[in-house]
Amino acid sequence: MWPIWRKYRYRACFQTGASDAFSEQMFALIGLGGNAIRGSAQLDCKRLLPYLGLLSMRVHSAALIEAVLRYYFKHAPVFIEQWVERRVEVADFQRNCLGITRCDLGENLVLGHQVSDRSAKFRVHVLALSWQQFHAFLPTGKGYQPLCSLVRLTMRDPLEYDLRLVLAAGEIRALHIGARNVCRLGWTSWLDHEQADGVVTFAGNFH
């Protein structure tokens, strides 16, 4: 009876690091089958086990992405801002030119080389961060790559996204010139820090 009992109880089959056969099959549902693929994902994949069922669905909502990010990083104040405006370059062959029948006035004629668009970009807000957490999620920190990798994994469509980091109240440090300075110029340094918002926004593909 023991092999039969064990077969249908995941907790009994589970092996450290989610290296058992059933976990391997579950990871395959979201495209992470194989140790090589999981190793290149820059994620602690076993932390995704509770959400593998939802992540295997064809459609991922903003609420699901929020929930996965909150659970993975153990940080509740995370939310997704949808329909963020961006500027899109108009391709040369789509631009209006005199003497060429391409656009109709009042219908699809656009002046300029760019148009405003809100259909293909969102923003990930990570709020109430401590000083150490804030630095960890910067592009120079150890949490940046896992954050970007997890966002890309949970996206079903190739959308653009920004990351917006917000320091918790009272966490902003004063900028000092010299060896005792703890601020990074351009990232965590603000003039008149007592009045600063402690916010930095950068593209998800920043390197």
What are these regions (language model features)?
Residues 2-5, 9-72, 76-97:
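Feature for intrinsically disordered/low-complexity regulatory segments and propeptides
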Residues 67, 71-207:
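C-terminal structured domains
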